């Protein structure tokens, strides 16, 4: 005995519902994995940026004044950006990834509904086959045939009722799925817009801090660091003394102690007396 048109329609309906559930399970699962990976990579980017902030601060401590100030302010802005990125990660996790994960349990419930429907359909098909077999074996036994017809009628009514319930359930499922799709992607775009809006503000400030670095001033500081003030003052004193010595240089007079000067004078007088005696002897 072939299926009735109503049974064939219910089978086609169940098959279509099953394909729809399979489709949602496949693509929502893929979306969930991809969004989760997106969040993980964003979190890793936040961690790398934290390392960058730390290194910029460390390097800034070794630099000249305006470079140091510019880098410190830049690092502060970059750290602020990571706070916004952390908020982005948390919002994506709670508003996008988690709702997608919840579809795992939703799909499981729909499969159970489909299983109940298929069981009812199989029971109907079994009763229909039983009735056909009874008619062939006992065509004159109206009691057995009537009982088989009653069982088939009951199975058909159950299958019809369960199919109606499944149709209503899947209709609600599709309605909720469409709302969730709209909400999930709206949340994703909104979260990204908020983050990138804040990022533009923060990065603009960071850019300005770098532009505020005074290269000429810091270059002068660096040059002065090559000639410290103490070294320069000593160098100036040496140069000044050198110039003074060259202009005041003249004949040198060797000073003698008083004792030496008296001794020399006595020796000179003795020499003069000897000269006088010699000259007198020559005259005689």
Curated annotation (Swiss-Prot):
User: How does it sit in the bilayer?
Assistant: Peripheral membrane protein
Which is a Gene Ontology cellular component entry for this protein?
sperm annulus
Q: Where in the cell is it found?
A: Cytoplasm; Cytoplasm, Cytoskeleton, Microtubule organizing center, Centrosome, Centriole; Nucleus; Mitochondrion inner membrane
Listed under GO biological process in this entry are:
cilium assembly; inner mitochondrial membrane organization; positive regulation of smoothened signaling pathway; spermatogenesis
Q: Where is the composition biased (Acidic residues)?
A: 267-284
Domain topic, free-text comment? The BAR-like domain displays limited similarity to other BAR domains.
* Designated name of the protein: CBY1-interacting BAR domain-containing protein 1-A
């Amino acid at each position: 005995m072939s299926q009735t048109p109503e049974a064939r329609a219910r089978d086609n309906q169940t098959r279509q519902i099953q394909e729809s559930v399979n489709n949602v399970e496949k693509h929502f699962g893929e979306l969930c994995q991809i969004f989760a990976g997106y969040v993980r990579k964003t979190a890793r980017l936040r961690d790398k940026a934290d390392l960058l902030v730390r290194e910029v601060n460390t390097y800034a401590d070794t630099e000249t004044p305006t470079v140091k100030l510019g880098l410190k302010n830049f690092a502060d802005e970059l750290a602020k950006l990571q706070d916004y990125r952390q908020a982005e990660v948390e919002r994506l996790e709670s508003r996008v990834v988690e709702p997608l994960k919840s579809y795992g349990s939703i799909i499981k419930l729909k499969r159970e509904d489909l299983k109940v429907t298929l069981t009812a359909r199989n029971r109907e098909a079994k009763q229909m086959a039983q009735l056909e077999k009874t008619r062939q074996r006992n065509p004159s036994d109206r009691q057995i045939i009537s009982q088989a017809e009653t069982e088939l009628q009951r199975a058909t009514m159950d299958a019809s009722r369960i199919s109606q319930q499944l149709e209503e359930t899947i209709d609600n499922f599709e309605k909720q799925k469409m709302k969730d799709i709209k909400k999930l992607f709206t949340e994703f775009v909104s979260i990204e817009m908020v983050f990138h809006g804040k990022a533009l503000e923060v990065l603009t400030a960071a850019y300005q801090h770098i532009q505020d670095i005074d290269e000429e001033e810091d270059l002068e500081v660096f040059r002065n660091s090559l000639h410290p003030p103490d070294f320069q003052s000593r160098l100036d004193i040496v140069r000044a003394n050198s110039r003074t010595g060259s202009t005041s240089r003249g004949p040198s007079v060797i000073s003698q102690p008083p004792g030496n000067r008296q001794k020399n004078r006595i020796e000179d007088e003795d020499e003069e007396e000897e000269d006088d005696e010699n000259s007198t002897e020559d005259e005689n």
